[in-house]
């Protein structure tokens, strides 16, 4: 499965999360996954909450439109973004589109 898939208007992202990074950013491909660095530590769900907030801001959607489908407790996650308003260029490039 690819790192980024568009499915019925939603984005499916296969992510590799790097917690406790110096800043929040989409790093790029990491094998078959998209690497995302976040500043939050992987303690008591803080990294998941921070990731949801960061992705909501990045895709200009409410946090309720970010769903962790798989990987709640690990670094490897599958995320569904419901009807993203903006898709960053790093992701459109992976989808084979031009921004």
Swiss-Prot record:
InterPro entries: DUF167, YggU-like_sf. GO terms for cellular component: cytoplasm. It comes from the Bacteria. It holds the Pfam family DUF167. NCBIfam families: DUF167 family protein, PRK05090.1. Belongs to the UPF0235 family. This is UPF0235 protein Sbal223_1335. It comes from Shewanella baltica (strain OS223).
